[in-house]
Amino acid sequence: MAYSYTEKKRIRKDFGKLPNVMEVPYLLAIQLDSYRKFTQADRPADERLDIGLQAAFKSVFPIVSYSGNAALEYVSYALGKPVFDVSECVLRGATYAVPLRVKVRLIIYDRESSSKAIKDIKEQEVYMGEIPLMTDNGTFVINGTERVIVSQLHRSPGVFFEHDKGKTHSSGKLLYSARVIPYRGSWLDFEFDPKDLVYVRIDRRRKLPATILLRALGYSAEEMLDMFFETSRVFLAEDNIKLELVPSRLRGEVTTFEIKDADGNVIVEDGRRITARHIRQLEKSNVTELQVPAEYVLGKALANNVIDTNTGEVLFECNSEITEEVLEGLRSANVSEFQILYTNDLDCGPFLSDTLRTDPTRTELEALVEIYRMMRPGEPPTKESAEGLFQNLFFSNERYDLSAVGRMKFNRRLGRDEETGEGTLSREDIVDVLRTLISIRNGQGTVDDIDHLGNRRVRSVGEMAENQFRVGLVRVERAVKERLSMAESEGLMPQDLINAKPVAAAVKEFFGSSQLSQFMDQNNPLSEITHKRRVSALGPGGLTRERAGFEVRDVHPTHYGRVCPIETPEGPNIGLINSLATYARTNNYGFLESPHRKVVDGKVTDEIEYLSAINESQYVIAQASAATDGEGRLTDDLVSVRYQNEFTLKAAADVQYMDVSPRQVVSVAASLIPFLEHDDANRALMGSNMQRQAVPTLKADKPVVGTGMERNVARDSGVCVVAKRGGKIESVDAGRIVVRVADEETPAGDAGVDIYNLIKYTRSNQNTCINQRPIVGPGDSISRGDILADGPSVDLGELALGQNMRIAFMTWNGYNFEDSILVSERVVQEDRFTTIHIQELTCIARDTKLGSEEITADIPNVGEGALAKLDESGIVYVGAEVGAGDILVGKVTPKGETQLTPEEKLLRAIFGEKASDVKDTSLRVPSSVKGTVIDVQVFTRDGLEKDQRSLDIEKAQLDQVRKDLNEEYRIVEGATFARLRSSLVGNLASSGKGVKKGEAVTDEMLNAIDRDDWFKVRMADDALNEQLDLAEQQLVERRKELDERFEDKKRKLATGDDLAPGVLKIVKVYLAIKRRIQPGDKMAGRHGNKGVISVIMPVEDMPYDENGEPIDIVLNPLGVPSRMNVGQILETHLGLASKGLGRKIDNMVKQQREIAELRKFLGEIYNEIGQGYKIEDLDSFSDEEILELARNLRGGVPMATRAFDGAAESEIKALLKLADLPESGQMSLFDGRTGDAFMRPVTVGYMYMLKLNHLVDDKMHARSTGSYSLVTQQPLGGKAQFGGQRFGEMEVWALEAYGAAYTLQEMLTVKSDDVNGRTKMYKNIVDGDHRMEPGMPESFNVLVKEIRSLGINIELEQDS
């Protein structure tokens, strides 16, 4: 097998027993694909599909004027080029976007002609605002911040049938309902009430009898009954009543009379329930009519209008209940036969018939008016308005759209064959929904499960952006329609008709302030990936936290392989925000689907099919871990399978599909937890959430016990530099990597040089540090997709969120009580958990009413010392070390002119005009921050003169750009000439300077002539002459292009910045803060085992083993049993084995053993013990590569134990044995303070520990003096306000309990809100007198005022 550049350097031993059938797909595909479909930027305008922007334009255009004499048609759209690149946008606080230009055509028709003759056509490109572009990593830069648009899981459009679970009515009766949900438009609900009448609601308004809707659709009462009921014929004679007998309809009824056959034999006795046996006898006896007593017919309903044949008048309307009078009337009218509705209580209820009786309307118009009244109460209805409203509700394309998904779901649910159709509803659609609802109420069919993933779909970025864009276009449409009528007369152009502001505003609002447009979580590469793969049920058109019940949040069987059952936040959002499973993707309809291998006749094939939750339940699907033989046949007689959302056992021959991988169930974060299968789900949830909070450490350290997913996450997250093309490394420094591309990957006319600029010490959204470090050296060969530089939390191309620490599970003097963690001082000395945080502090100079603020080093009443770190422009130097309270940017603000006292006037008169009054409003370092200034950026308003510092920064940036571009040209030039040299040498020349005709060109010849003269050389072979001309032309073009790029950059830097109104200048100062680990910091493992550091002990006091090696971290063993996360113990054992093997390899390297011996030992580790599916091909490694591999393994042999397919206990023991370590994983430890051995052996090993972004430095602060609340005059709370610690109700009770009266008085008065007491106390302390005189607390005055506001007067009486 082929190894990538980094894999060769450090192979991870894989314990997986199952073959890797399918590579993990690109993890950001859901974001990138969705937005690519939205913009279709890579397709030519005429080949664009009807999706995304194209669909939005097509749905709104053409816009026709009210008179119909003018129309505006859409032709195509084009996306421009972004003004700034991503990094410039972040720096300037701009949005990374491209201008959208739309080509539209204005057509004016001739008014006079009868047929629509075209009078005039004008075509023009119109600017339609900017469309934010997605960066390569699936994020958006909006106003300078990186944001992510989270996908939304919402209810799919379509029709749903459900019941209220008996909650509505006290009797507990199930009330069924049906709901038609469109993609946009009014919702239509049908529902039963406790009396079994059917009602309809539109948009959840007041309910009306369902028959009103049917009447409004143009159905008469007779047609309604005919559609929903079967009829029975009744023959009416003078003395008897006979019923046409359909035996099957009698099933389950209790007879009130005897039923006899033609011969008079009794088939069913009186009072018996009719069974299937009776029905068979009746069918045999060929009885067609049955004489029934009159009572049988009473209470039934007529199926048709009964009409007097002579006069034609309606005697009895259909649906009339049959009473004695009705029977008499029928007999007297000589009606011999009529039809009644066939109903019974079992499977054919009289619901619609009963509803029709309560319906007050008689005609279609009355029904329309009734609906109008319900939708628009208080407005007088007219025939036209009522018809128009009803037409627009469900039958107009503008107002109603089921969408392709909705139509597909709708037709499938109603059992129709075709999956496509109109986006609007038809009469038949509504009738079918009602019919299905009634049959469900009759006990035929089942209700839907709304939490089934076949009924919930994912709306990704592209789709949401398209919806917002359409909203903007619809607003534009209204304005355009009004202007179009003017266009006919005034000869306007399309430009004058379209105002793009509403579109731009809608798009901007969506990206800037939608609930689903979130500030990207950029703690580490994993948190970025997880954020982009998140699926939220909240947001516009989704659920709200308060309303979401338990069922929506719960894990559903259809989540298997689509949504992770583990990773979800704890707290109010649990279950509403989920993460996509590793292999899941969305299909064209937006439903999540998961890959499966096809199984044919018990043999597993490599053919992979994606199944959505809708299709999955009908198949029999085996687990990925099902046993197979060498040919892929299932070996077990009974295989554990999933079928119809249940787990069951089936014969091997019945299996139709098989899972692709055991980790397809979990998300990326959960699949990074080793031994996940041994952890309790709640702890695994915490583990996967806490990995996202790990802060990138100064030196990344790969986990020795991993899962094999680390490489995928690092590669796909976008924090590393990945080679676009293969080749050789030309040069490397800390800031850039230059690759000379291999010939086979270089297209003709390309210089074949790739230059990668690295990101250095940049601030992330979470104030952590983003920095890339090259891992390749000059001369290294690389191929496409190899990792060239590690990003934050990446080590040799693998995700490395924390550090491998030597830990012991034991108690130690109570320092690890309640999950506390005891840490050795060695961890601090080695900077294992030292992290760099970068803070951005901003100083803004504004234009105020009293004059403009000024950034200057001339600050009133500030000593020389405080200004030492500022330059002449008043801005701090880069590299200065600053602490709390230091000035970073000097700024003065004009003060209001105060009224002068006579004395001041006199002084002014004597000493002349004093400097204008300004106050110091400089930017200072916040309390508890100490760091180094690493960068300063100055932005000046366009039109203002730049200060010296801005000019210096600008010059430095320009020099850097010029240097980069020259370097780039030099490299390209070198590569070009090297290529030419290889082509020319050895071939015959025909003319040129320094060469002789007919001679073969040599290296010496070429070295002798000037490079510019190379192009003048003519060769005998014309192909070579062409190559020379092409190369010359390319170099000229490249130079030109680089010069243009330089000029462009220069222009951008020279023009002023576009700042907010009233802002003159912005200075941004970036501070790098180094944070060592200290007591109070939060740490965690990957198994949900979190704790706070209680103390940092000297190394000599820590427990140590027989070899004198001390422990780094001591954890509490009581944290394991109750939490049931045993994975951490297995990780500790395997970590110990890994480090032990590393130590053995280290010794072999130090002793300079034979390479063959090393090779054999490595083979033993990788290919003998715990032999997985993957066999490492060490024979393909050269001796140098084996030696380099061995050197990289000295710190521990990395292991991969995948979720549900990991290392077995026996394998861990075998590796411990190979490493010459005790198989129990326990060893005797000695107390560092006394040297005595502890009572029993202790579990010692290596665990991967993370430092979480909950640092004590960010949380702890102390208040000395600070601001007070305005009304209560009590100190504020919280770190941001520099607030105090609240002495609350319970604390007061504690002091009361101790009887500490004076302390309590002090707390409630001078230390809180006794204003006069505070001042007096301050004076006393200044005078050296430490007495306190408490006064009246301000909060008491507030209470008095509040009581007075109720009209009760309270006054305090003075004690005389």
Curated annotation (Swiss-Prot):
<dbReference type="GO" id="GO:0032549">
    <property type="term" value="F:ribonucleoside binding"/>
</dbReference>
<dbReference type="InterPro" id="IPR007644">
    <property type="entry name" value="RNA_pol_bsu_protrusion"/>
</dbReference>
<dbReference type="InterPro" id="IPR037034">
    <property type="entry name" value="RNA_pol_Rpb2_2_sf"/>
</dbReference>
<comment type="subunit">
    <text>The RNAP catalytic core consists of 2 alpha, 1 beta, 1 beta' and 1 omega subunit. When a sigma factor is associated with the core the holoenzyme is formed, which can initiate transcription.</text>
</comment>
<comment type="function">
    <text>DNA-dependent RNA polymerase catalyzes the transcription of DNA into RNA using the four ribonucleoside triphosphates as substrates.</text>
</comment>
<dbReference type="GO" id="GO:0003899">
    <property type="term" value="F:DNA-directed RNA polymerase activity"/>
</dbReference>
<dbReference type="GO" id="GO:0003677">
    <property type="term" value="F:DNA binding"/>
</dbReference>
<dbReference type="InterPro" id="IPR007642">
    <property type="entry name" value="RNA_pol_Rpb2_2"/>
</dbReference>
<dbReference type="InterPro" id="IPR014724">
    <property type="entry name" value="RNA_pol_RPB2_OB-fold"/>
</dbReference>
<keyword id="KW-0808">Transferase</keyword>
<dbReference type="InterPro" id="IPR007645">
    <property type="entry name" value="RNA_pol_Rpb2_3"/>
</dbReference>
<keyword id="KW-0240">DNA-directed RNA polymerase</keyword>
<dbReference type="InterPro" id="IPR010243">
    <property type="entry name" value="RNA_pol_bsu_bac"/>
</dbReference>
<dbReference type="InterPro" id="IPR007120">
    <property type="entry name" value="DNA-dir_RNAP_su2_dom"/>
</dbReference>
<dbReference type="GO" id="GO:0000428">
    <property type="term" value="C:DNA-directed RNA polymerase complex"/>
</dbReference>
<dbReference type="GO" id="GO:0006351">
    <property type="term" value="P:DNA-templated transcription"/>
</dbReference>
<dbReference type="Pfam" id="PF04561">
    <property type="entry name" value="RNA_pol_Rpb2_2"/>
</dbReference>
<dbReference type="InterPro" id="IPR042107">
    <property type="entry name" value="DNA-dir_RNA_pol_bsu_ext_1_sf"/>
</dbReference>
<dbReference type="InterPro" id="IPR019462">
    <property type="entry name" value="DNA-dir_RNA_pol_bsu_external_1"/>
</dbReference>
<keyword id="KW-0804">Transcription</keyword>
<dbReference type="InterPro" id="IPR007641">
    <property type="entry name" value="RNA_pol_Rpb2_7"/>
</dbReference>
<comment type="similarity">
    <text>Belongs to the RNA polymerase beta chain family.</text>
</comment>
<dbReference type="Pfam" id="PF10385">
    <property type="entry name" value="RNA_pol_Rpb2_45"/>
</dbReference>
<protein>
    <recommendedName>
        <fullName>DNA-directed RNA polymerase subunit beta</fullName>
        <ecNumber>2.7.7.6</ecNumber>
    </recommendedName>
</protein>
<dbReference type="Pfam" id="PF04563">
    <property type="entry name" value="RNA_pol_Rpb2_1"/>
</dbReference>
<dbReference type="Pfam" id="PF00562">
    <property type="entry name" value="RNA_pol_Rpb2_6"/>
</dbReference>
<dbReference type="InterPro" id="IPR007121">
    <property type="entry name" value="RNA_pol_bsu_CS"/>
</dbReference>
<dbReference type="Pfam" id="PF04565">
    <property type="entry name" value="RNA_pol_Rpb2_3"/>
</dbReference>
<keyword id="KW-0548">Nucleotidyltransferase</keyword>
<dbReference type="InterPro" id="IPR037033">
    <property type="entry name" value="DNA-dir_RNAP_su2_hyb_sf"/>
</dbReference>
<dbReference type="InterPro" id="IPR015712">
    <property type="entry name" value="DNA-dir_RNA_pol_su2"/>
</dbReference>
<dbReference type="Pfam" id="PF04560">
    <property type="entry name" value="RNA_pol_Rpb2_7"/>
</dbReference>
